């Protein structure tokens, strides 16, 4: 598991492939999926595998965001050191507790959460590198069955 590589490439794609010009996003909009990917990625997480309740973590594009959910709960995302250079997650806390997993569950978000990302310009190659930190993977499931 090398989440810092995803953090690097997610930011590269968002900066290179999306902008405010008429041709500001790549390819076909595909019923809103391309722009939805960008919005999720800018928040710092995105759904990768339909059929699971997991959102894979990247790195937020904003320093502070609040999502006011329909159920009255709020998701707060803070990344005060975030910048163009500081694209790597050094540490993440969820509701004030250190969090090493590379995914959030739908339930965590819907119950309201406070995510605090500590960002830096150097990748933390230890954070989220454990096998237990990896999100769902069908190929991982197949390996266990063998």
Mark where each language-model region is:
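Non-catalytic C-terminal accessory modules of carbohydrate-active enzymes
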Residues: 1-146
